[in-house]
Swiss-Prot record:
Classification lineage: Bacteria, Pseudomonadati, Pseudomonadota, Gammaproteobacteria, Enterobacterales
Pathway: Amino-acid biosynthesis; L-arginine biosynthesis; L-arginine from L-ornithine and carbamoyl phosphate: step 1/3
Binding sites annotated in the UniProt record for L-ornithine: N168, D232, S236, M237
Chief place of localization: cytoplasm
Localization of this protein: Cytoplasm
One of the record's GO molecular function terms: ornithine carbamoyltransferase activity
Pfam short name (any one): OTCace_N
Residues noted as binding carbamoyl phosphate in the record, renumbered to the chain: S56, T57, R58, T59, Q83, R107, H134, P135, T136, Q137, C274, L275, R320
EC number of this enzyme: 2.1.3.3
Amino-acid biosynthesis in keyword set: yes
Protein name in the entry: Ornithine carbamoyltransferase
HAMAP family cross-referenced by the UniProt entry: OTCase
Amino acid sequence: MNQFYKRHFLRLLDFTPAEIIALLDLATELKKDKKSGCEQQKLVGKNIALIFEKDSTRTRCSFEVAAYDQGARVTYLGPGGSQIGHKESIKDTARVLGRMYDGIQYRGYGQRVVETLAEFAGVPVWNGLTNEFHPTQLLADLLTMREHLPNKSLNKMTLAYLGDTRNNMGNSLLEAAALVGMDLRLVAPKACWPEEAFVISCQALAQKTGGKITLTEDIAEGVNGADFLYTDVWVSMGEPKEVWQERITLLKPYQVNMRVLALTGNPQVKFLHCLPAFHDDQTTIGKQMAEQYDLPGGMEVTEEVFESAHSIVFDQAENRLHTIKAVMVATMSKI
């Protein structure tokens, strides 16, 4: 029986550094098998519930395709497709679905919801995203970084994350860096730094793994020598418009553009983004942002960077599939 069998995947700190590497190795193997057409199905006969309280493209598609590739079946429960938290408690929903399904994915709001599902379902529960953490995204990020710097181990890599570092991506990057011993720089105005107690706890773990976690407002200092630059959207569509103006004004200096890439001093620096990205005006929201806030070349990242050879965002997006598949296979297959 493998070490992950019947375990949950709720946040990265539930795992050891060696276990994170093992999941990445499994994802690499599964990706290779899929590309070569020799993938072995280990989840035949399994049924999976996908609970989405927030809309999704990459996460939903990754879970569905990964399940189909492995011979499993899925039921999609969208934002209006279940009674969870409305007419039925999370606890009761967990106990019902746990009787019918072999695994449950949850993408929604509070971390406490996915933790309650895990406590009462009796089957593996996976966190597809909460307000606090996005662990499946970080597995894909780490796999992508390994692929693009094959001669460097993760504990020798440097990543700078620019923008609003208080969100689920900032939190999960802190956990990932602490676990694998990476040099992580969070580059943002102090108003957008993560909770201090959480940062201190991750820094303490990083000291044990050989990692380094730095928070700075200085862009040049933060990106110097970085192997990877990472950013995410500055505003969420559920937030009031008043917040947009304040946030964009605050974060505009932290836009990832060619000047910032040059400040790394690394001509081979790569750009990461968990997507979707506001890099042009080809979407309704993107056009609105460009016109209203004078951002013709993109918001958190410019079109020039996004479409450049530095950008590996679509490799990163593809790797959501392979890493999510690894999590499902590891937690639902005995072998």
